[in-house]
């Protein structure tokens, strides 16, 4: 049955130079083909992962890796951060790669020769937005509409993160209905002419997961629509 089997595929990067440097043998074309074949079966969940902070992958190239994997639309896109464990290959080459990392668990990289600390913070912001809106499975229809506005999924989540941060939404706990208000507010900021499409997408997402007895305050009142429909049917 759907979801009984789950595959976890450690892509880590789509940058050839990075893949070679970490001594992996992987043909990306084969990975894409396999992922799409499994996806077509619609009965196996796929979790694909990316690692930020790997050698030879700067901020812009990591964005490309993110976009490449997001385009496959796995059930989960797990964005992790390079860990430098004592005795590991990365530990032995930390100086060469300019790795700055936590010396206590979880030993994650904070910056490197290729990615600055500020850039790593931006990637962490993307990871938080990805978890809240994509990996949670709660806003998939909304995101499908929003993606049409963006050439880069990474930039989409980054803009969303900046919006959350600038409005003080990051440090607060929000229920699902409140979060729909926030993402609708964001959509109006970046794609003002299509509010109705975002509203319909959010209503679908909301009721797909839970049966709510009341509609969100921003949703259109269906009573008027019902009256119009009844009047039309009586007249015809």
Which residue stretches match the model-derived regions?
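Generic alpha-helical secondary structure signal
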Residues: 17, 29, 33, 60, ...
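Contiguous mid-protein beta-loop-alpha structural module that forms a pocket-lining wall or clamp
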Residues: 69-76, 80-169
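Radical SAM enzyme core and accessory elements
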Residues: 128-236
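Conserved non-cysteine loop/helix-boundary elements of the Radical SAM core domain that shape
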Residues: 1-104, 110-113
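Glutamate identity and glutamate-enriched acidic tracts
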Residues: 8, 21, 29, 57-60, ...
